[in-house]
Curated annotation (Swiss-Prot):
Residues annotated for substrate binding in this entry: 227, 239
Encoding gene (name): rihB
Assembly with partners or alone: Homotetramer.
GO cellular component: cytosol; protein-containing complex
Signal peptide coordinates: none
One function term, GO molecular function aspect: uridine nucleosidase activity
Protein name (record): Pyrimidine-specific ribonucleoside hydrolase RihB
Organism: Escherichia coli (strain K12)
């Protein structure tokens, strides 16, 4: 089985933690590094959350801090969903893990430039780190095998009626990425909201056990409450983890090729991913957009990753 080399760019975040847990353990993924961006909370908080998850699950992958601010817009955070720390719910031991001294953007550029074009970028937060890397060193563009991202929607947004949070948090960065010419796969809300983590799913992961089962339970029990209060959902979708699922087995997720453009005009559609689902513009598709996911397969995959953390000695 081919191992997909990836850099996971995230803003932990509850669903980000599940994505880290899966990417670090599944044999089909070679997780080279974790880069952190501001998003669900400010950078100082998302960095601590990423380090806490890695320490608890004994994930020995380097962690790099990146962009603390969006490229242009005023910063926003999703404390309504992720709480004051950005990862409210779990209680972690005192943190001893440290981030690398290299800036995430430099790490992304250097790693891609030294590669054979076989590295996939997996940004599951605002696209600030990726866009700055592209602008700073355009020679990385042909080196990127693919970008598999969580963000956007071809239907309704979740932070405004038009826009999904990750794109709305830095629309200008998203515009850079979506016009880059790099092969894109977009897991938007239309797909990710199909992964609502209901109490029975949480109970299943608790039964699977181990440190990852415990962490999954603590994380997703918190989002049960916030997702219901904010969106009336029966649980928290694990938005970001769908990207890892896609990389492990693309057949589990149905996609459609579309031309996607990010609206950067100020107005009610600021930050919208405008997806030409019907092809009315006649422009060539630049993105594979997630449509449906086989949820039975997906939760089986999550459980497989959770079980991977159980110590057998």
């Amino acid at each position: 089985m081919e191992k997909r080399k990836i850099i996971l760019d995230c803003d932990p975040g509850h669903d980000d933690a599940i994505a880290i847990m899966m990417a670090a353990k599944h044999p089909a993924i070679d997780l080279l590094g974790i880069t952190i961006v501001a998003g669900n909370q400010t950078l100082d908080k998302t960095l601590i959350n990423g380090l806490n998850v890695c320490q608890k699950l004994e994930i020995n992958v380097p962690v790099y801090a990146g962009m603390p601010q969006p490229i242009m817009r005023q910063q926003i955070v999703a404390d309504n969903i992720h709480g004051e720390t950005g990862l409210d719910g779990p209680v972690f031991e005192p943190l001893t893990r440290q981030a690398e001294s290299t800036h995430a953007v430099k790490y992304i550029i250097d790693t891609l430039m030294a590669s054979d074009g076989d590295i996939t970028l997996v940004p599951v937060g605002p696209l600030s780190n990726i866009a700055v890397a592209m602008r700073m060193q355009p020679a990385i563009l042909p080196k990127i095998r693919e970008i598999v991202l969580m963000g956007g929607a071809y239907g309704t947004g979740n932070f405004t009626p038009s826009a999904e949070f990750n794109i709305f948090a830095d629309p200008e960065a998203a515009r850079v990425v979506f016009t880059s010419g790099v092969p894109l796969v977009m897991m938007g809300l239309d797909l990710t909201n199909q992964t609502v983590c209901t109490p029975d799913v949480i109970a299943r992961m608790e039964r699977a056990g181990g440190p990852a089962g415990e962490l999954f339970s603590d994380i997703m029990n918190f989002t049960l409450k916030t997702q219901f209060e904010n969106y009336g959902l029966a649980g928290g979708p694990v938005h970001d983890a769908t990207c890892i699922g896609y990389l492990i087995n693309p057949d589990g997720i149905k996609t459609q090729e579309m031309y996607v453009e990010v609206d950067v005009n100020s107005g009610p559609c600021y930050g919208r991913t405008v997806c030409d689902e019907l092809g009315v513009l006649g422009k060539p598709a630049n993105t594979k957009v997630g449509i449906t996911i086989d949820t039975d397969w997906f939760w089986g995959l999550v459980e497989e990753c959770v079980r991977g953390y159980i110590k057998t000695h």
